[in-house]
Amino acid sequence: MKTYGVIKNAVSLDVVDFANAYLLLKRQVLQTFFKKRYINPFSHDWGTFNDAQVPNTYAIYGDIAMDTLLKGLKPVMEKKARELLSCTYSYARVYKKGDVLVRHKDRFSCEISC
């Protein structure tokens, strides 16, 4: 049986503010890169707007800042889970008004998520 838990205040407001500003700026950079045709529109190096779960919404896989946040949260998650964990990947999405993430089942590597 799976159990779920919430870890309140796992991330400080300063870190939340940084991550929010960082991802908003990264989204703007990608929009500029596409508009100016600096990068191939099929490249996902700077993120994507083509995530099937939430279309037309900025998302990024394996961003170094998000990987750093994940690494920092690892001890907190291990304490809550009461087991050693391996960080497999980071994924971030910037939701906008009207976006909906429908209930779904993540892949097995997401057994424990933060």
How does the language model describe each region?
Residues 1-81:
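Non-heme Fe(II)/2-oxoglutarate
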Residues 70-113:
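Conserved double-stranded beta-helix
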